[in-house]
Amino acid sequence: MDAVSMYKYQREAWKRPKDSYVGELLKERLPKWRKGPSVQRIKRPTRIERARRLGYRAKPGYVVVRVRVPKGGRRKSRPKKGRRPKRMGKNKFSPGKSKQWIAEERAQRKYPNLEVLNSYWVGEDGQYKYYEVIMVDPYHPQIKSDHRINWICQKSQKGRVFRGKTGAGKKARGLRKRGKGAEKVRPSLRAHRRRGK
């Protein structure tokens, strides 16, 4: 089986995890991931075909981090001071960003010297969702000399995940849509008083 067909086989298996060998792998791995740290650096990607499509290369300067994010709505703490229940502002609040984007931000805070390139889903159970985040060292000589990735060394890419410049961030900002119906997502949601989404 050549490399192209192997990647295609893996891609099809991950599309329907429960119907393929992936389901058995996740049953084995998820309990271990649940017990481990919430942000953990790993040696190599779990989904090599997905990681490579998103820009990962097996060379120095690339780092893969697995992040665990709790499922469900936002956990807002209850205000200590008194007020009527209507003004508590505790329930039914949404963070306005996906779990994947939150996972990318957590990886960035853990490794502030790296930059987030992209991320992908690797599993979920009743409590958590798990994502793998591809990170790049913009100061590494091999990254600086690689014309395919050295754009991430520019100053304008610093802290890109916090400004919604990754794939998950752009999706949450509504930037996948163009033309009719997307008049209020550009130049930004804030410029249109959050009416774009």
Curated annotation (Swiss-Prot):
Residues 70-90, 163-179, 187-197 have a biased composition (Basic residues). Keywords: Ribonucleoprotein, Ribosomal protein. Residues 70-99, 163-197 are annotated as: Disordered. Pfam families: Ribosomal_L15e (PF00827). One of its GO terms (cellular component) is cytosolic large ribosomal subunit. InterPro entries: Rbsml_eL15_core_dom_sf (IPR024794), Ribosomal_eL15 (IPR000439), Ribosomal_eL15_arc (IPR020926), Ribosomal_eL15_CS (IPR020925), Ribosomal_uL23/eL15/eS24_sf (IPR012678). One of its GO terms (biological process) is cytoplasmic translation. Belongs to the eukaryotic ribosomal protein eL15 family. This is Large ribosomal subunit protein eL15. It comes from Methanopyrus kandleri (strain AV19 / DSM 6324 / JCM 9639 / NBRC 100938).
